[in-house]
A protein has these predicted regions:
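N-terminal glycine/serine-rich phosphate-binding loop of ATP-dependent small-molecule kinases
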Residues: 1-94, 122, 213, 226-232, ...
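Active-site core segments that coordinate phosphate-bearing ligands/cofactors
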Residues: 5-6, 105, 112-126, 132-175, ...
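Extracytoplasmic/secreted proteins and extracellular or luminal domains
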Residues: 63-66, 204, 391
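Local beta-strand N-terminus motif with an aromatic residue
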Residues: 69-70, 208, 395
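Carbohydrate-associated surface elements
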Residues: 101
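A structural motif corresponding to the C-terminal end of an alpha-helix
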Residues: 200-207
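Core alpha/beta catalytic barrel or barrel-like domain that forms the active/cofactor pocket
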Residues: 210-216
Length: 488
């Protein structure tokens, strides 16, 4: 039996997972880390704590499993989150600015007003938004004096979380095309940093990592990982797409976690969205041409359930929400738009704020809980409808993964609203599996068509609602969305 493993560094926790050659989880360990909120627009992580949790996860697994048996390791990570550290000391200059952070809206407004850079920005496939790394780097340069000073000595590296982990493991500065494609500084056609964007905002190209294919050799760690080669690096959502075996054009998946992230494989074609979606790199295998995707992102999915629990105390645990929501046959006319820090795709409205509408004396916590769950399905509908418009074709089946797929009420409602079949695989850790599988494919030099690991369906849901009812629900959702827009 052969084994391959994954470092899965997410928004709220780090994990190390070992898989066997059949895709079964052999061992794993997970550790949550601290979320910092310096003000209402800011979300930060401690890069040192992130690394410490990764180390601890690997050590805990090593107590139970001989990691020398592992043939290869993949890294998958929260994307866009940006870290700046010293090349000479390895110490961070500042906390990691997380993808959810919106403090840089003024910088984004400044960028959008500058016509001289619009053509270059369009080549990134991304809209100008606080979500991506560019505005975070500009903010760090302007607001952290030690960074500005150290840049004059070529002693700064700006990187996404994958680059930070690769550095801590190997001492090198590397990233892959999927993570680079989330920075707003990467030309998705040439697969290089866009030097015009860098020069415009005084970001030295020497302060950025070397860009490599997703499936390639990133080196190894002498001590922690016993010289096991790191042969794949992917952003978390691309790893999920890969783990779902969406290797052919037109395959689509949606991940339900802290946020929601839907991706469709567009093959070697770069599809620039006209409907508010992102164009991104899905993966690149060695020197082959990259595979592209279009993506829709929702900021608040599972995070909305956490808000019910932590801020409103309507539920005590996240798992309770399904039973509470099932206490009522429907939402009682209540709709919730979780635009806590604006709306992502396809609306892209940073001035939107959360609204709870349709309340009456009849409304109760069960209706509100149901509305929070249903908001996840409605937001996903908006993403997937936009995808079909961009591609000029519809899809029949949606592959789903993430923690929220355990919620049967949500998945059935999603099938009803989409009017499509939904399936989930029997591998729950699909993101980590995707990165580990990619590493295994590279080390074995397999063709994607030769991957014969059988992913069985664990659950499926089919639509079971009248078209008239569906249209009524969607009409009310669209009215609620309009209420949330242009709030500030």
């Amino acid at each position: 039996m052969e084994y391959f493993a994954s470092i899965d560094q997410g928004t709220t926790s780090s994990r190390f997972i070992v898989f066997d050659e059949n895709g079964n989880v052999t061992d794993q360990h997970q550790i949550e880390f601290t979320q910092y909120f310096p003000n209402e627009n800011s979300v930060e992580h401690d890069p040192v704590e992130i690394w410490d949790t990764v180390v601890q996860c690997i050590k805990e697994v090593s107590k139970r499993f001989d990691i020398k048996k592992i043939k290869s390791i993949g890294i998958t990570n929260q994307r866009e989150t940006t870290i700046a550290w010293s090349k000479s000391t390895g110490k961070p200059f500042y906390n990691a600015i997380v993808w959810q952070d919106t403090r840089t809206q003024d910088i984004c407004d400044e960028i959008m007003k500058d016509d001289s850079i619009k053509s270059d920005l369009s080549r990134t496939g991304l809209p100008v938004a606080t979500y991506f790394s560019l505005s975070k780097i500009i903010w760090l340069i302007r607001n952290v004096p030690t960074i500005k000073k150290s840049l004059t000595n070529n002693d700064v590296i700006f990187g996404t979380v994958d680059t930070w982990l690769i550095y801590k493991l190997t001492g090198t500065f590397q990233t892959d095309v999927t993570n680079a494609s989330r920075t707003l500084m990467f030309d998705i056609e040439s697969l290089q940093w866009n030097e015009n964007i860098l020069k415009k905002y005084n970001i030295p190209i020497d302060s950025l990592a070397e860009i490599k294919p997703s499936l390639s050799n990133f080196g190894s760690s002498n001590n922690l990982l016993k010289d096991i080669p790191i042969t794949a690096v992917m952003g978390d959502q691309q790893a999920s797409l890969f783990g779902q075996h969406c290797f052919t054009k037109g395959k689509v998946k949606n991940t339900y976690g802290t946020g929601c992230f839907a991706l469709t494989n567009t093959g070697e074609d770069i599809v620039y969205s006209k409907n508010g979606l992102l164009t991104t790199v899905a993966y690149q295998y060695g020197n082959d041409k990259p595979t592209y995707a279009i993506e829709g992102s929702v900021a608040i999915a599972g995070a909305g359930v956490q808000w019910l629990r932590d801020n409103l105390n309507i539920i005590q645990t996240s798992e309770e929400i399904e039973n509470i929501a099932l206490s009522e046959k429907d939402n009682g006319g209540v709709y919730f738009v979780p635009a806590f820090s604006g709306l992502f795709s396809p609306h892209w409205d940073p001035t939107a704020r959360g609204v709870l509408v349709g309340l009456s004396r009849h409304s109760n916590k069960h209706h509100i809980s149901r509305a929070v769950l249903e908001s996840v399905a409605y937001q996903s509908y908006d993403l997937l409808e936009s995808m079909e418009k961009d591609l000029g074709q519809s899809f029949n089946e949606l592959k789903v993964d993430g923690g929220m797929v355990e919620n049967n009420l949500l998945m059935q409602f999603q099938a009803d609203i989409l009017n499509k079949n939904i399936v989930t695989r029997d591998i729950k850790e699909i993101t980590a599996y995707g990165a580990a599988l990619a590493s295994y494919i590279f080390i074995k030099q397999l063709k994607l068509s030769e991957v014969n690991i059988n992913l069985n369906y664990a659950s499926s849901w089919s639509p079971n609602v009248d078209a008239q009812v569906r249209d009524k629900y969607l009409n009310n959702w669209n009215k609620a969305i309009e209420k949330a827009k242009n709030w500030i």
